[in-house]
């Protein structure tokens, strides 16, 4: 019995430890098809006293990723490199370098005034063990002439039913990460409305 337990314990220990950042950034690889179900999803939102057009212009000048703050296990992006196309155009691909030295590759799926969606599928951090891909959606909902609801949904597609359990355990921290970034962006964007 001991012969079986020791390798199992070693395997579990290796799975729980965080991988080291790569020496070389990952290259582009073909993305999987975007799933239609089986996601673990988190949504956050904020109402901002700007029109959709003005809010989108603000985010063009000040990219949303600049408002993301680290949590205990989630590292925010600190740099980006466009690999294919022109970022924000459908089909464009970029590589994000995270604060902890890891990388994520993502692509634009759709970009309209009221909706921006993207897919992330290359991860060099621990997410690679349990996450197949992420389908992100940012909606811009008109509430009035000068008010927009920004709604951000993060749909995480686990690799299996087993990894879905572990992904589900990350929901509170993912919620904190998303809420903090969304509220910081909303405050900064809202402040521009007061100087118009």
Regions found by a protein language model. Give the residues of each.
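Positively charged n-region of N-terminal signal peptides that target proteins for export
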Residues: 1-4
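Hydrophobic ligand-binding cavity/cleft-lining segments
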Residues: 16-83
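Hydrophobic/aromatic beta-strand elements that line small-molecule binding cavities or substrate pockets
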Residues: 44-46, 104-110, 134-142
């Amino acid at each position: 019995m001991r012969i079986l337990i020791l390798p199992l314990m070693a395997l579990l220990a290796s799975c729980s430890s965080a991988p080291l950042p790569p020496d070389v950034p990952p290259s582009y690889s073909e993305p999987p098809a975007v799933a239609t179900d089986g996601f673990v999803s988190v949504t956050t939102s904020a109402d901002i006293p700007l029109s959709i057009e003005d809010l989108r212009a603000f985010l063009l000048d000040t990219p949303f990723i600049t408002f993301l703050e680290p949590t205990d296990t989630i590292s925010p992006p600190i740099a980006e490199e466009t690999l294919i196309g022109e970022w924000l155009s459908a089909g464009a691909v970029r590589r994000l370098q995270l604060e902890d030295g890891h990388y994520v590759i993502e692509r634009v799926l759709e970009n309209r005034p009221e909706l921006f969606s993207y897919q992330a599928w290359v991860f060099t951090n621990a997410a690679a063990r349990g996450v197949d891909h992420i389908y992100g959606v940012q909606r811009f909902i008109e509430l009035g002439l000068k008010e927009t609801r920004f709604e951000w949904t993060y749909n995480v597609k686990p690799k299996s039913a087993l990894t879905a359990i572990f992904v589900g355990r990350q929901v509170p921290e993912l919620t904190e990460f998303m809420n903090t970034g969304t509220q910081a962006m909303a405050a900064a964007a809202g402040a521009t409305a007061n100087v118009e």
